[in-house]
Amino acid sequence: MLAPHAAGLAAGWTEDGGGVEVRTFRYAPERYEVLGYGRTLESDERVRGGAAAMTPLYGLGLHRAVRRLLARERFDLVHAHWIVPNGVIAAAAVGTTPLAIGLHGSDVFLAEKPGVRVLARRTLARSRLLTGCSPELVDRVRALGFPAERSRVIPYGVDVATFAPDPARRGIWRERLGVPDGAPLLLGVGRMATKKGFQVLLETLPGLLAARPDAHVVLAGAGDLFDRFTVLSAQWPGRLHLPGKVLRDTLPDLFRAADLFVLPAVHDAKGNVDGLPNVILEAMASGLPVVASGISGIPLAVEDGATGRLVPEKDPGKLLAALLELVGDPGRARAMGERGRGKAETELTWDAVAARYREGYELALSMPG
């Protein structure tokens, strides 16, 4: 794996990477190495000025690193994740080595922009395989010019051991947040960005708390909308909890504290959308029923009526009805969570996902060069 430098990244993955060797590259002094997720996009909609200024340096650094690596070692295939910028840069650097492109969400939004589209098309012309975590993302990029027979929709995986239910740890986060043992706790996790749809969830709170005044809602994460949500939370003191960014090693216990997971994802005003949020898979592995929007790659994981409820995006009325349905029937909610856990264990483990990638790689390598 080749990745841009981030403090502790290579050391952490090498330690428990399961045989994956991690190489990193530098492209600027550490304080300026800001490309990636919240540090690159403002609310996942606009490129921040500082990040835009670093993009040429990032491109040069990645190009040099790929060329250097391929000169020293032989690789059967290069799989560049995010068509923009990594796929574009890799296509210019790999020479005759076969190339695959992986799609994740914001990269597709960028690839469709008029000034970038021509680069994306050239990258696709150089690629043998296209993978994506949702049918929508794959279809949107195929529309730029890529054959369906060489496209694969492959969901993300989840570590079902790390996120296993553990009733003995259910009270850790409840005590920290001041949520009583028997109170319904609805959990959302993710960056505070428009496409996560938390603003839609907040629209349901008056109705939710009128029907269930004992309910608590926890939205965990940081981002550009956090301050706005903090101001709004004053309307529901002691009922809407915003703990901010949660450390990765404490996240499983936060899921264990919850009764229901909610992520009402949306297409934002510019068409940007998540592929398949990892937190949905983590919630399923934790044995939680999931209420989410039925868009993008989410229906690959959540089965409406079986492992949770899928609702139309940007529809607070339908979202509220689904939340009240499950909060009002704890037995049914638990059964949905158990089925979700079973699906995670059988279909969404990393071994299952790796097998699907392996099939795609074999297809790519069987093509004439």
Regions found by a protein language model. Give the residues of each.
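Carbohydrate-associated surface elements
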Residues: 5, 136, 157
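A short helix/loop element that forms part of the nucleotide-sugar donor recognition site in Leloir-type
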Residues: 14, 164-179
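Conserved donor-binding/catalytic core segment of Leloir-type glycosyltransferases
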Residues: 131, 180-196, 202-206
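Nucleotide-activated donor-binding/catalytic signature segment of Leloir-type glycosyltransferases, i.e.
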Residues: 227-250
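Acidic donor-binding loop of glycosyltransferase active sites
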Residues: 256-273, 288
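Short hydrophobic beta-strand element within catalytic cores of glycosyltransferases
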Residues: 280, 285, 289-292, 302
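Conserved acidic donor-binding segment of nucleotide-sugar-dependent glycosyltransferases
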Residues: 301-305, 309-316, 325-331
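A short, well-ordered alpha-helix in the C-terminal region of glycosyltransferases
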Residues: 318, 325, 332-347, 356-359, ...
